A protein has these predicted regions:
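A short Gly-Trp-Pro
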Residues: 1-143
């Protein structure tokens, strides 16, 4: 996984812009229902970043707080109030999960992990993954 630094991204209408100044921790694909719904697709993706390495350049995102599907801690979800694009959500403990599709250039990124494979659509294959989790990473049930 590689990302030219600094990298910038933002929402679809351009009202909100951000800059990434540090290396990503990881990029993951998630097949949980929450990620499917927020992405509008059959999976979601999250680029884990240290909160200190994410700088807001312009605009002010709106925030919606939702409970976690697996009963874990609630997540604060940040999005553009004008175009509605989800930009990131809190990952806990000083981390943010950036939606990589909001980056100006995500062409060098490739996921290494996937979670919630028990909810993965059967026709999807993602090459190059190092780790797959049957449910939530960190739980006993792994696939």
């Amino acid at each position: 996984m590689s990302l030219a630094l600094p990298s910038e991204g933002g929402c679809q209408c351009g009202e909100i812009r951000y800059r990434l100044t540090g290396e990503p921790v990881w990029l993951a694909v998630c097949h949980c229902n929450d990620c499917k719904m927020q992405s509008g697709g059959v999976f979601g993706m999250s680029l884990r970043m240290r909160e200190a390495d994410v700088k807001l350049i312009s605009g002010e995102p709106k925030c919606w707080t939702r409970p976690s599907e697996n009963g874990g801690r609630a997540k604060n979800c940040y999005f553009c109030g004008t175009c509605g694009i989800r930009l990131w959500h809190t990952g806990g403990l000083g981390f943010l999960s950036i939606k990589p599709g909001t980056l100006d250039d995500s062409s060098l990124l490739a996921p290494r992990y996937e979670g919630w494979t028990k909810r993965k659509v059967p026709w999807l294959t993602i090459d190059g993954l190092e780790v797959s989790h049957y449910t939530q990473p960190g739980t006993a049930a792994r696939g």
